[in-house]
């Protein structure tokens, strides 16, 4: 969507005739000239029946060849969606209008609205009809969100042919819409993984940042202490250099690090990435985010997955085609994402942040490239240390332990939500000592997550 133009006084612009309509008028003029020439030729050579039949046949075929292209000219498709986001199991109404702008009728039109799997349509999504000049036909259907994701509604493919069905033309309209089906959330019980208290009540055990307003006491000077921390009055009283101590900064929220690399989920379908274990990981992230935000804390998101929006080209313009295969190819989304960028949502609070996070998680797809441990190490210098780094992954190996150890040495509080596939045998863990691990095999485990403290 383009930004609204700046407000201002604009001179009235004369109405311009669309290029397609002007092209149609030129074709009409050419057709009348051709018909006149044929009639003149027929008048001069009317002595032979076979010549007459040949001229008539040629005229019929010529007109038939022009009709399919002429029918597609001057057609306008308008689309509207009742909403752009919907919960799983929710519905949204899709409306479509097909308008004939030209002076001639549009004959023998077959239109079909392309709707991606994940949105189950109920209602009219195709039709066969002819449109009079300036006539508009309207249709609507109800779309049911059946699974998490970003789904395209449209484009419409319009097919027309000559009266004999010998020549067919296809048009793919550029008008499309998108519906985001949000992930499920589960109510988490009281408590929090780092203890029986909410995050904001848990002081940090190690911290590179301290709260200077929370004076704790003094201690003897050690090599490397900053001179700005020296407590001069205590030094004068004791005769030894004394350094001020402050309480470590309290934790302000959680950073959800979600593993979405294709190598970590070998059982997930390559094209759609829909898999019960993958969906459970996304549900866990959305549920934890909601729990923390409701308690007034901040949530950030980091993932090595891809954005489903990258599957759809931004320069979509539609077009007209002679072959059905070309039209169908044009309506398909890319099977792969051309370039992957790690998903990163800045820390935030409140309802707006929850909506932002759920939308980002809805569009999250599996992607090749960096693993989650590699991403955590690469992003460690810029991650906020006031947030708990909570990794959500299906495997505790693959370098995750080393990455969490690096983060702990840098002053981060860390934890792991282990998404284990039903029936899978527990894998050997290689995590640093003291890192809390929370096993999640289904949504029931998520409901009990808040009461766990390891």
PLM segments and residue spans:
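Short, charge-rich amphipathic segments
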Residues: 22-35, 92, 168, 204-225, ...
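Exposed, interaction-prone extracellular/peripheral surfaces
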Residues: 2-13, 174, 192, 220-454
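Extracellular/lumenal glycan-associated context and N-glycosylation machinery
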Residues: 1-79
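Short N-terminal helix-initiation segments at or just after the protein's N-terminus
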Residues: 20-24, 36-44, 86, 121-125, ...
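An amphipathic, basic-hydrophobic helix/alpha-beta surface used to engage anionic
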Residues: 49-51, 59-320, 388-392, 406
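Short, structured coil/loop segments at alpha-helix boundaries
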Residues: 26, 47-48, 116-117, 184, ...
């Amino acid at each position: 969507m383009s930004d609204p133009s700046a407000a201002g006084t604009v001179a009235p612009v004369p109405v311009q005739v669309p290029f397609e309509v002007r092209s149609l008028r030129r074709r009409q003029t050419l057709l009348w000239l051709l018909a006149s020439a044929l009639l003149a030729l027929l008048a001069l050579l009317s002595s032979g029946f076979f010549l007459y039949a040949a001229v008539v046949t040629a005229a019929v075929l010529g007109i038939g060849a022009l009709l399919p292209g002429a029918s597609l000219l001057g057609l306008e498709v308008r689309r509207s969606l009742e909403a752009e986001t919907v919960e799983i199991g929710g519905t949204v109404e899709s409306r479509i209008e097909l308008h004939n702008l030209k002076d001639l009728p549009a004959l023998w039109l077959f239109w079909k609205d392309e709707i991606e799997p994940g949105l189950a349509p109920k209602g009219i999504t195709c039709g066969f009809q002819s449109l009079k000049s300036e006539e508009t036909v309207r249709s609507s259907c109800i779309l049911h969100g059946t699974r998490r994701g970003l789904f395209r509604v449209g484009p419409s493919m319009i097919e027309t042919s000559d009266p004999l069905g010998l020549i067919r033309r296809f048009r793919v309209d550029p008008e499309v819409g998108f519906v985001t089906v949000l992930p499920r959330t589960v109510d988490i019980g009281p408590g929090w993984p780092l203890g029986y208290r909410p995050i904001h009540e848990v002081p940090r055990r190690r911290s590179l940042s301290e709260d200077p307003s929370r004076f704790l006491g003094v201690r003897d000077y050690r090599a490397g202490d900053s001179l700005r921390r020296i407590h001069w009055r205590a030094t004068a009283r004791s005769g030894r250099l004394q350094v001020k101590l402050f309480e470590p900064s309290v934790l302000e929220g959680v950073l959800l690090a979600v593993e979405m690399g294709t190598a970590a989920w070998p059982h997930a379908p390559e094209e759609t990435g829909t898999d019960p274990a993958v969906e459970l990981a996304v549900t866990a992230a959305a549920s934890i985010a909601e729990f923390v935000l409701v308690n007034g804390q901040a949530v950030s998101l980091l993932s090595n997955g891809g954005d489903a929006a990258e599957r759809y080209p931004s320069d979509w313009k539609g077009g007209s085609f002679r072959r059905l295969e070309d039209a169908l190819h044009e309506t398909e989304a890319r099977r792969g994402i051309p370039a992957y960028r790690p998903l990163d949502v800045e820390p935030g609070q409140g309802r707006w942040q929850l909506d932002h996070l759920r939308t980002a998680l809805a569009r999250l797809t599996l992607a090749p490239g960096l693993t989650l441990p590699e991403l955590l190490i690469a992003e460690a210098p810029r991650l906020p240390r006031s947030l708990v780094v909570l990794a959500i992954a299906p495997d505790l190996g693959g370098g995750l332990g080393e990455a969490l150890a690096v983060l702990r040495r840098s002053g981060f509080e860390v934890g792991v939500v282990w998404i284990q596939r039903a029936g899978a045998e527990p894998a050997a863990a290689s995590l640093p000592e003291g890192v809390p691990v929370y096993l999640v095999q289904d949504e029931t485990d998520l409901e009990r997550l808040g009461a766990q403290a390891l």
